[in-house]
Regions:
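Amphipathic alpha-helical hairpins
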Residues: 1-171
Length: 171
């Protein structure tokens, strides 16, 4: 659907955010199946739960503006999963897998953050301040997840560095 007006552009972007959030929830489930780290699994389960709440908020946005999500044809998330499956299958190290999964989570999360940032501005520009408020809360949830993911990565790296120092000191 080519967008010709600000409203059509907003509807297309909101539809894309809904689809991306829905697909991201499925990706979180698949990523969680690859990793054995309980902290990462917990984070993914929590994120999947929060994603369902975000979908509810986005659906409310559509209700407020009196529209339905548009049909989209993008394959970004399918390609993301295909590439992920190929790359992670070749990894042997559990630590490398954990970091890889978290890096992929970071990529996916930052795509969502960018979408929500634009949507908040677009909602305000089109006069849908209630919608902007709901989208801002979606953005906040996603920013928290990005920060938590960053902290998980830091924790894994700190443990790995400490292990290396212990080996070096023992030698």
């Amino acid at each position: 659907m080519p967008a010709k007006t600000h409203k059509e552009t907003f509807l297309m972007l909101l539809s894309h955010a809904r689809e991306a959030t829905e697909k991201a929830s499925k990706i979180y489930d698949e990523l969680g199946g690859v990793i054995q780290d309980p902290q990462v699994k917990d984070a993914l389960e929590a994120r999947a739960f929060v994603s369902q709440n975000i979908l509810t908020k986005i659906d409310q946005c559509f209700k407020i503006i009196g529209e339905q999500p548009a049909k989209l044809s993008g394959r970004l998330h399918e390609t993301f999963l295909e590439d992920f499956r190929k790359e992670v299958a070749e990894m042997q190290s559990p630590t490398a897998k954990r970091l890889f999964v978290l890096a992929k989570l970071g990529q996916l999360t930052h795509l969502l953050i960018a979408e929500y940032e634009v949507l908040v501005a677009a909602a305000d520009a089109t006069g849908h301040y209630g919608v902007g408020f709901l989208l801002e809360s979606c953005l906040a949830d996603t920013l928290v997840f990005a920060d938590r993911t960053r902290r998980l990565i830091s924790g894994i790296v700190e443990i790995r560095v400490a292990e290396r120092k212990g080996v070096e000191q023992a030698a």
